[in-house]
A protein has these predicted regions:
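Conserved SGNH/GDSL esterase-like catalytic core that processes O-acyl groups on lipids
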Residues: 1-33, 37-130
Length: 130
């Protein structure tokens, strides 16, 4: 279960949109429970593209359940607001960044269609710079 928090900064205890991103070659059946409420279930047929299931509202907690996933790759989750700066973190500690070259450009384009980026910052640790 993912939950907002308020230990480090204010206004992080809730979000307005929560999403899960995946690619599937077979049927995927997902359920989501927002704020410990009723379960919402949706089924996705394969379409050869990055897919997203999204819920909206005042979200303090969200629990995703994969009920069925035939040949599926799950890429990540997002909990976002509807205004301000949104930060995505792809943690690659100890990496020189060469692994980024192995991500197919078509997949990067599909992510950019789902989550349009205005700025990308690459950060590397001291162990790579040394």
């Amino acid at each position: 279960e993912l939950r907002g928090q308020n230990k480090y900064a204010s206004l992080l205890d809730t979000c307005q949109e929560a999403s899960i991103f995946f690619y599937n070659k077979g049927i995927v059946d997902l359920s989501v429970r927002v704020n410990r409420g009723e379960m919402q279930t949706r089924q996705f047929e394969p379409n050869g593209r990055l897919q997203e299931m999204q819920v909206k509202g005042r979200i303090g907690s969200v629990r995703w359940t994969v009920n069925q996933a035939d040949s599926a790759l799950f890429y990540g989750l997002a909990m976002d607001g509807t205004e301000g700066v949104i930060l995505d973190n792809f943690s690659l500690r100890g990496s020189s960044g060469l692994s980024l070259r192995t991500i197919p450009s078509e997949m990067l384009k599909e992510f950019n269609m789902q989550r349009p980026y205005d700025l990308i910052i690459l950060q590397y640790g001291l162990n790579v710079a040394a």
